């Protein structure tokens, strides 16, 4: 589902990284991949190409709980997530265990300043967060926003600067 939006969302993250030096970027499919270095290229096409080459599980489905656990264990809890605004760009579809998603989102939420989740599907008329990963994550999210258009990304940019 997110495939349609993935390139635009990664370009958005690249643009944010070009404006701020304290941004880290990861992709989460069936595994967690840090792409901060790849997205540091000034040229957006080069950055996107480098990121795509670094991600082995592009379009391979999503295991949100396991990936968020890996982030928490390796990067987040004792490091970069502490006191940070964490932005998750996802449709919430998950191939893993929803209980793990809930547990790991709760764990992440305890150490962050806030969690912002941008879901491209949220703009769909009559959308309800019924995907099991999205439903499990929702109680631990501070801002649940759309992520499907230029205007929604502009609004997201404003939200991130608050």
Question: Across the structure, where does each feature detected by a protein language model lie?
Answer:
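Active-site proximal loops enriched in glycine and acidic residues that flank catalytic Cys/His/Asp
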Residues: 6, 27-30, 88-92, 97, ...
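Extended hydrophobic-aromatic, low-complexity segments
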Residues: 5, 18, 25, 36-37, ...
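Exposed acidic/Ser/Thr-rich ligand/metal-binding surfaces
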Residues: 65-111, 145, 155, 159-162
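Von Willebrand factor
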Residues: 1-84, 86-87, 126-129
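A short acidic, amphipathic alpha-helical/loop segment
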Residues: 8, 12, 100-107, 133
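Von Willebrand factor type A / integrin I
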Residues: 105-162
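Short glycine-/polar-rich loops that comprise or flank the Walker A/P-loop
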Residues: 19-23, 83-84, 111-114, 140-141
């Amino acid at each position: 589902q997110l495939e349609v939006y993935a390139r635009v969302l990664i370009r958005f993250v690249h643009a944010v990284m070009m404006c701020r030096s304290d941004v880290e970027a990861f992709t989460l499919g069936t595994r967690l991949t840090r792409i901060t270095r790849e997205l540091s290229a000034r040229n957006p096409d080069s950055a996107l190409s480098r990121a795509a080459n670094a991600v082995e599980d592009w379009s391979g489905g999503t295991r949100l709980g396991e990936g968020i656990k890996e982030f928490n264990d390796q990067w987040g809890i004792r490091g970069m997530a502490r006191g940070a605004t964490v932005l998750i760009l996802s449709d919430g579809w998950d191939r893993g265990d929803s209980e793990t998603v809930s547990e790991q989102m709760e764990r992440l939420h305890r150490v962050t300043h806030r969690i912002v989740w941008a879901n491209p599907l949220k703009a769909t008329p009559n959308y309800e967060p019924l995907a099991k990963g999205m439903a499990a994550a929702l109680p631990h999210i501070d801002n649940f926003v759309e992520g499907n258009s230029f205007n929604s990304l502009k609004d997201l940019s404003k939200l991130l600067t608050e």
